[in-house]
Amino acid sequence: MDVQAEDLFRDVESDAFVNESHGGTGFQQNFSAWPGAFQVAWPLTNHQDLASETQDNGNKSGGDEIDVSLCDSQQQGRSRTSSLVNGLLTELYDTYRGGAGCYYFRQQDSVDSSTEASGSDAFLSRSNPESGFLQELSERQSSRHQMLYLKQKDCSELKAIKDELNRRIAIQSAKLLRQVKQKDRLQHKVQKNCDIVTACLQAVSQKRRVDTKLKFTLEPSLGQNGFQQWYDALKAVARLPTGIPKEWRKRVWLTLADHYLHSISIDWDKTMRFTFNDRSNPDDDSMGIQIVKDLHRTGCSSYCGQEAEQDRVVLKRVLLAYARWNKTIGYCQGFNILAALILEVMEGNEGDALKVMIYLIDKVLPDSYFANNLRALSVDMAVFRDLVRMKLPELSQHLDVLQRTANKESGGGYEPPLTNVFTMQWFLTLFATCLPNHTVLKIWDSVFFEGSEILLRVSLAIWAKLGEQIECCQNSDDFYSTMGRLTQEMLEDSLIDSNELMQTVYSMAQFPFPQLAELREKYTYNITPFPAPVKSASFSGRTSKMRDSDEENEIDEDDVNANAVGCLGPFSGFLAPELQKYQKQIKDQKEEQSLKASNIAELSPGAIDSCRSEYHAVFNSMMMERMTTDINALKQQYSRIKKRQLQQINQVYIAADKGPVSCILPSQVNNSPVINHLLLGKKLKQVNRSKNALHLPASKSSLLANEETKAKQNSPWRTHIRVHRKNIARAKGELGHGDTIGLIDEQNEVPKDQPDTSKETEETAQPPCSSAGEETSLDRTVMKVDGRSPEPVYQDENANVTVVQSKLEALELSPDAETEVSLEMSQTFQESQSDSHSSSSESESFKKSPKVQVFSPFPSVKPLKKSATARNLGLYGPNSRTPSVNFPHMSKTFNKAANGTTGSKKR
């Protein structure tokens, strides 16, 4: 795209002096419409210059019409230029010449002239009486004095003043109208040029669907997608060989910065008052001293020397303002170079320079890029070395050979990666100290739109350009001397062409750079940053065998610790103190083995430790031992989690007391046993119970029972379970379904007035006699204490398997077993009737007239109250108002399963 700026400026200058009043519909006809306006003689016949001006202006008026239709010709352009010169000369001579007839020309003004001589200052200085009146009136500041001044004048003088005011208003109105028309024409031309740029951008684009939506504008348009549309178009302009024009750069950078500050809701006026107020920040003295030291080292010529003292003051204010804005970063060496270049683009405006600096450091560059430890910078340097291996493998291998050779020749010293010395300076100053100014500005334009990825791309392009001369170096000394010469050539703009450099940057790979995000994430957690406080005495080098940082492919210690601890889940907190203690021990050993006062981590990021393999081996063995000892803790935690889940389920059931009543528990709908999924796939252990049987004396068993009773008597959960089982047994008894659990609980309940029940408790603690095929074993001991149902006490790691086996056996009962269970239930029920008078009376009344009550399997403190509304709705059963509803009842198969389970527990 080649746009001729001279043609545009010629059109603009010619359109600035368009005569709109000499046509048939000019200002002469409009001016005569003013009431009381004085008569003006238009000298179109006597004065030769004015006649020629009229003729030329007529031609110019026609030229304007053709200019609007974009069909100008060269001859008409020349006529406009001649009319411009003639009009200026005529205006000057007619306004200020003396002699006869000058008063006649002094009483009129060229309405359509836009020069300073014919402005308001020119006719205000004229010596007519009306102008004198207006001048005296303007000297009265207050309206009261002006009123008094006008009251002193007669009617003729007031009419003359009025006519003079009308004449001036008419002249200014004509000028304003002409300026508005000129603005419309210029906006039309700007839109035409923007359309040309849009067509060029779409022509050189990749013909994607997104590229068809490109629309170039100088400023973001109003609307939801106005800024994004402008951003995409300017990003495409920055990719062109010529880049963003220097006339647009200030406006483009400020637009980006303003949009960022608006997105984070910053009150800029308040920020300006805070950041540029020296009195509110008295603790910046030390920072100001450091800034003053760096100001004299600024590379920009406009900030060096005795003549640039005022510019250095402005630069210091901007640097201090950013340090107050971002106190986390404060001031970093290299900021003076960045701020100087920004101030140069912003034409010395402090506020605008601070805006752009905030946008560049806080938004564009990665976090902690200029922090105390320069972590993000060290990450980018490590990533850049990987990119050099990928894109420039021959150069990378050659530099590795030079580095290894230098390490061998140094006799125990360390040679950092050869690219680090130069790449660090390039990244810190964003190439402001190694490339010419116009090339740096193009790079910055791309950085503002594409991000910090441009820095890596430009570095790759520069090393690719320098690679041919670097490959001739035989050792590291030759490399550094060659790079010193090449750096000077780059700065003098004799080695790298800016257009070629930017084309290489954009054609290198697609955006974003492949694998760049993965590499940055990898080195973010696998890198040793530059230490903020450098300790020269506490750290030292090592004489043992070391590996180059470029060849590092192992996992860092932090990653090993994080992965190992993270795999343990909830037990990671147990290992954290031990890991910290172990890492401290390893660190102390390293310090004892050190011999020199230099640390590799301080010289280069990603340095390798000499005892890494030993550290990994010891750490892995420790982790394996720790994991084996924590299996029991894992089992205990799993059992606690399971109990909590059961408690939550019971709480949900209890809370649902107001819901629809059902005689079937949710836990009894599915008769399948609960299986521990951690034990799936584990073979059942065949236990010979006859050989492993262990007979405990009665005294020891009674002691165990008493201890178990004391430990569990005051448990609120046990009390809740006992009440829950009693309610289930009582409800089933009322419905005609027997259950021995509640009856046994009632029979073995310890009343307050019977002190001899402790003996019965001791007797029930004895293991009952089983059938001929079963004997008491060590693996399982059945205890029954405090009126509770028997529960097994497990003492073996296969306890969960035994529970599953016992439940499975309980589900498959023979008919004989069912008969025994029913007989035992009837006997137990009769014994309970003979023991308690209240219970016998209730049972007799139940036998005589069985009354089905509302069954609620949940314990409740107060009896349920029946409401009339619920009874009418049929919630308590059928009545006269509601039809008969068949409510669900317990099936026979369910009764058998429940009774069989109870019988198995009793055995």
From Swiss-Prot:
A Pfam family assignment: DUF4682
Residues of the Rab-GAP TBC domain: 243-451
Bias (Basic and acidic residues): 749-762
Keyword Hydrolase in record: no
Keywords of the record: Coiled coil
Coiled coil regions, renumbered to chain: 583-645
Region ranges (Disordered): 51-74, 731-781, 812-859, 872-907
InterPro entries tied to this protein: Rab-GAP-TBC_dom, Rab-GAP_TBC_sf, Tbc1d30_C
Keyword Manganese: no
Low complexity composition bias: residue spans: 831-843
Biased composition (Polar residues): 892-907
Function: May act as a GTPase-activating protein for Rab family protein(s).
Record's protein name: TBC1 domain family member 30
Taxonomic source organism: Xenopus tropicalis (Western clawed frog)
Gene this protein is translated from: tbc1d30
